[in-house]
Amino acid sequence: MKPIPDKNFLKFLGKSLVEHQIENIKKAGFEEIIIVGGAHNLGALEKLGHKVVEQKNLDEGMAGAMMSIESHLEARDEVLLLSANDYLDEDAYKLIKKTASSSDAELLMLAKKVTSYFPGGYIAVDGTRITGIVEKPGEGNEPSDMINIVLHMHKKPLEFIKKIKECKTANDDWYEIAIAKSIEDGSFVQAVPYEGFWQAVKYPWHALALQKHFFGTIKEPQIADSAQIADSAVIRGAVIIEEGAKIMEHATITGPAYIGRDVVVANNALVRESEIGAQSVVGYSSEVARSNLGNNVWLHMNYVGDSILGDDVMLGAGAVTGNFRLDQENVKMEVEGNKISSQTNKFGAVVGPNTKIGINVSMMPGSKIGASSLISGGVIIDKEIPDSSFVKGHNELQIRKNNKA
């Protein structure tokens, strides 16, 4: 998700992703929650009011997370393990809890049927018994149409942690190797089929897809008493407007949308299907469409479409995000040196926190601009910009034949 520093703290309807996860866990009746984090986010996690444990080596993945909580477990404890990056409705938690209560399986794993290839773990099944796990088998090599969703109920977690230690490996699938070894040794590992909502949050466009889901939960307009709405402003549809927000003359908010605390939507501005974080300013004549803006973002005569802007981002007048290729093909983004398709023909830019972008900057579809960067005016951004960069340049015309004419 770079340049967004921690996707667990992306906000949807004013709450971080991890807060939404905790709410769903509680609604399903789970009481004791342990959050496993790294040195980079322990402080933020501790503010959530639950026990926080540090995983020293994040490269150990879920295996490391399980080992990190070992000293907090007692012999009769059961553990529900989930990934904060996989969002599921509360029904998923209730389903696995209910199934586990009458199952003699040592491990229960949520499983979801997919209709197209997903680059994750696939399970081989015999009835409800899982007979194997294949990580990223490649399209056409899937052992079934069921994928492993990281919502796992461990009935004997201390025994499984012992298995993890026996299977020590430098591979990033250490946890899955331990499950495979458990299956090989005769443990009953049960698949729990799930048909409800699920959204992995791996790439930036996944966050926008999840935002759309949260917007679908807004049933009616919710406007705080202290919000100031000009008589000539237009509010349409399912919109949440928080305390202290100001919607000025001739501004339009088209839902579903979320306007955070103390936000200013200035004259003639348009916000549609977007989240605007607290204390942000959508300045005069700006348009924000299908985007997620962090806290304290400042716009002035800008177009931001299908984009994610981190906290404390500022756009100078005339800076715009391009979100649609002229050839109408799916937008691609560079991720760790590889071009990854967004699977959509509308996707704009991702800008890291505390970045300032000058006047008349054009961000091409799929652009990434790192955190704490300065982009001077008038440039075209068509490549990945690392964190803490200063970007200045001139544009040069390159003319060649249009082979798609």
Model-predicted regions and their roles:
Residues S101, G127-F215:
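Catalytic-core segments of class I nucleotidyltransferases/pyrophosphorylases
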Residues G283-A405:
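Glycine-rich hexapeptide-repeat left-handed beta-helix
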Residues L42-G127:
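Conserved beta-loop-beta/alpha segment of the NTase-like Rossmann-fold superfamily
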Residues M1-A44, H50, E54-N57:
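N-terminal glycine-rich phosphate-binding loop and ensuing alpha1 helix
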Residues E32-G38, L108-A111, V234:
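Short, hydrophobic beta-strand segments that form beta-sheet elements in well-ordered domains
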Residues E31-I33, E78, E106, F188:
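Residues at the starts of beta-strands that form the adenosine-phosphate
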Residues F214-S232:
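Long, charged amphipathic helices and adjacent flexible linkers at domain junctions
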Residues A230-E287, S291:
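Acidic, glycine-rich loop-and-beta core segments that form the ion-binding/anion-interacting portion
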